Amino acid sequence: MMPGVYALLLLWGLATPCLGLLETVGTLARIDKDELGKAIQNSLVGGPILQNVLGTVTSVNQGLLGAGGLLGGGGLLSYGGLFSLVEELSGLKIEELTLPTVSIKLLPGVGVQLSLHTKVSLHGSGPLVGLLQLAAEVNVSSKVALGMSPRGTPILILKRCNTLLGHISLTSGLLPTPIFGLVEQTLCKVLPGLLCPVVDSVLSVVNELLGATLSLVPLGPLGSVEFTLATLPLISNQYIELDINPIVKSIAGDVIDFPKPRLPVKMPPKEDHTSQVTVPLYLFNTVFGLLQTNGALDLDITPEMVPRNIPLTTTDLAALAPEALGKLPPGQHLLLSLRVMKSPMILLQNKKVTVSIPVTIHVLSSVPQGTPVALFQMNGVMTLNAHLVPSTTKLHISLSLERLTVQLASSFSQPFDASRLEEWLSDVVRAAYMQKLNEHLEVGIPLPKILNVNFANSVVDVIENAVVLTVAP
């Protein structure tokens, strides 16, 4: 291992979670020990890890008691040894390894205590004992440290591995008591070399999952988000905490740094047997900021974009504010040009997500085959309610208009009270603008990959400056 990694391990051992304020505006992930245990168990199911152990000691005369074992040249049971009568007993090999039961204990500030309880079936043969079959219960106990890989990902590193041999039973054949004792001693010596590599293989699989936490997630036409570790991970007796820093990049790969909230997030306590991930206000600001700078929040609304019950003509406008038309005749189509010149403001608090979009609305009279005539301009604020739906990889957002307030900025005829148009404008925005806006929001807010935790069925909790997703394993 590299010296730098050892140094990180030492520092990690001193790090334990603190309750209260989250001193970051990044993404916080709390991985419950049950989720870690499930990842380890899944790595053993259906994979090659256990099958590889079966091929370790299989060839005749190469078994535990074969040519290279106790019966081999110089072994205790070799020719001339104390038990030369059974010198031909050979080929004792692992025939089956029962799917281990996984037990996890988190050691705050230290690492992980990992136990695998399994049952090993062995068989062999000899001229005196005939077909021989043994079954042994084994507990593999290992101490695992949390470290950081050279590329900055969290990594589990095996520090110590021991095997404790439990009950051994003879399921077939005859074996003299002295030989049975020697077999037991041999298994105690050999099994660590066979089963501890299983732990190494399991950790390799889990480390691949942990490495996927720090990944580049596309944001569609807006760019991408790269998740990196902001600080060293922390360990409590119930969960591992990862402080993840989301780095937003443009399509060209340039880092985009939107303003971040100054106040830290006060995290709610995590319940036992649950995992959490937070989506910070910063990511909401980033997505809406990118939409604004890319012009995705701007829209020109024509009569074809609204249903017939929401007319866009000078006749209907005259009924609400006749002084706004000047000398224009009735029956002409209207064009509404919506421009968002500043980034929207997102408010996360009191279990509610509110989006405020400052908008400038230009109202023009559209003349067939002619240049539109500017009538007046309004400045307004669209207040939108957000509905959040988590999936496996994203937090999806859909918006609905709560209210639209406007003030007259300029008029080419007479001044008037623009608030009289708010209800009519709200109908137009709901019919035409909200659909386009929600289409742009289909990119969603990406979630970091946390040990394949599926947040699709998570409970969504909106707290101040963050959204918390909680899922039970």
From Swiss-Prot:
Keyword list, A-Z: Disulfide bond, Glycoprotein, Secreted, Signal
Tissue specificity: Highly expressed in olfactory mucosa but undetectable in thymus, kidney, lung, brain, spleen and liver.
Isomerase in keyword set: no
Top-rank taxon, per record: Eukaryota
GO cellular component, one term: cytoplasm
InterPro entries reported in the protein's UniProt record: Bactericidal_perm-incr_a/b_dom, BPI_fold-BPI/LBP, Lipid-bd_serum_glycop_C, Lipid-bd_serum_glycop_N
Annotated signal peptide: 1-20
Subcellular localization, as worded in the UniProt entry: Secreted
Residues listed as glycosylation sites in the UniProt record: 139
Keyword Glycoprotein: yes
A GO MF label: lipid binding
Positions of disulphide bridges: 161-196
Its job: May have the capacity to recognize and bind specific classes of odorants. May act as a carrier molecule, transporting odorants across the mucus layer to access receptor sites. May serve as a primary defense mechanism by recognizing and removing potentially harmful odorants or pathogenic microorganisms from the mucosa or clearing excess odorant from mucus to enable new odorant stimuli to be received.
Family (UniProt): Belongs to the BPI/LBP/Plunc superfamily. BPI/LBP family.
Name this protein carries in UniProt: BPI fold-containing family B member 3
Lineage: Eukaryota, Metazoa, Chordata, Craniata, Vertebrata
Gene name per UniProt: Bpifb3
